[in-house]
């Protein structure tokens, strides 16, 4: 449970849920200080028995930053004292997933609730890091890289499925002709209309390049996840690029496809009713617009310091040009 109501698209940058260590009882006190700090968009919020909650930790009056706590949400099917949840309401898509808000009212957690692989509070109330030179939230944020690759793949999979279903419809849809062809040939099909035929071909070419790039990012990230290492700057940039590029490419192609198939796009079985899924992808694991601004800022900062921006001339930069390159997508950088 990371996202908070007030944070909006700055999820992860804004976290006001509080966890204070009570040395007298050797417990953490988890609290939502105001409504804007309530956890929001929490999947399985109505069914989960346990949750990993991100909260700003204070030990001995000193703030030590965001940390993760494993806690019981429910015991015996009932919410634990101090925890309240609510329905976020009907969404435009994904209503099979129960997204809830969660509020904590001075919920007490044992000292063992702190996920302490990288930092801990001992029985005397002393805070100490266990992993040198890496803030605990950086290790938590490591999972964002996995999420960005997964979001990119999800957007590409949705696009592929929508195009597959729509192509099958278009190939079976006759286009009325003013007169029969002298040869007796069957009526032309919707898929043969030039603009639709061109869009199908364009989509295959563009998607193949983006999919190749995302796949390379996954291949480079996987061994780092196994060892717990953080990606280098070039791979971080490439993964962010992959997420933005995959989602924006899918949005562009799917929206254009919708314009070409008329009232078919209004049918519930067509798949177009779930186009807002791509909006979910746009905002998940880092809003694409903010993520793009961050990438630009980081590269300008490197340039201002006289350093070659991450990736040089660069694999990540190349991903932004993959639609104009005749060869396959640029390889994802190694560490």
Question: Which stretches of residues belong to each language-model region?
Answer:
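Long amphipathic alpha-helical scaffold regions
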Residues: 15-22, 34-35, 54
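Internal glycine-rich alpha/beta core junctions
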Residues: 21-29, 71-334
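Short Gly/Pro-enriched turn/cap motifs at secondary-structure boundaries
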Residues: 6-10, 43, 91-98
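Sensory/regulatory domains in signal-transduction proteins
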Residues: 5, 36-38, 283
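A short core secondary-structure module
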Residues: 27-84
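Short beta-strand-initiation
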Residues: 12-15, 48-50, 64, 97-99
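A gly/ser-rich beta-alpha-beta helix-loop segment of oxidoreductase catalytic cores
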Residues: 1-19
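Short beta-alpha junctions and helix-cap segments that line functional grooves
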Residues: 15, 40-42, 87-90
């Amino acid at each position: 449970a990371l996202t908070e109501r007030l944070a909006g698209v700055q999820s992860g940058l804004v976290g006001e849920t509080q966890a204070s260590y009570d040395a007298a009882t050797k417990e953490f006190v988890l609290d939502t200080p105001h409504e804007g700090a309530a956890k929001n968009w929490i999947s399985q919020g109505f069914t989960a028995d346990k949750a990993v909650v991100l909260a700003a930790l204070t030990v001995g009056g000193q703030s030590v930053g965001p940390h993760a706590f494993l806690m019981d949400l429910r015991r015996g099917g009932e919410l634990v004292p101090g925890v309240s949840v609510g329905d976020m309401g009907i969404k435009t898509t994904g209503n099979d997933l129960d997204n809830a808000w969660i509020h904590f009212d001075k919920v007490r957690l044992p000292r063992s609730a702190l996920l302490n692989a990288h930092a801990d509070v001992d029985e005397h109330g002393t805070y100490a890091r266990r992993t040198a030179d890496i803030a605990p939230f950086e290790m938590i944020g490591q999972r964002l890289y996995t999420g960005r690759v997964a979001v990119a793949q999800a957007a590409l999979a949705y696009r592929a499925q929508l195009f597959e279903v729509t192509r099958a419809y278009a190939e079976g849809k006759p286009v009325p002709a003013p007169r029969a062809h002298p040869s007796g040939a069957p009526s032309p099909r919707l898929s043969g209309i030039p603009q639709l035929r061109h869009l199908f071909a364009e989509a295959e070419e563009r998607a193949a390049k983006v999919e190749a790039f995302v796949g390379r990012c996954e291949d480079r990230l996987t061994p780092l996840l196994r060892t717990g290492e953080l990606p280098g700057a070039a791979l971080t940039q490439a993964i962010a690029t992959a997420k933005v590029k995959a989602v924006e490419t899918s949005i562009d192609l799917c929206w254009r496809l919708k314009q070409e198939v008329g009232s078919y796009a209004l049918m519930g079985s067509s798949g177009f009713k779930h186009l807002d899924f791509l909006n979910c992808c746009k905002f998940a694991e880092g809003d694409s617009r903010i993520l793009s601004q961050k990438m630009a800022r980081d590269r300008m900062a490197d340039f201002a310091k006289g350093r070659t921006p991450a990736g040089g001339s660069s694999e990540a930069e190349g991903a932004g040009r993959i639609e104009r390159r005749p060869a396959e997508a640029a390889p994802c950088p190694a560490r």
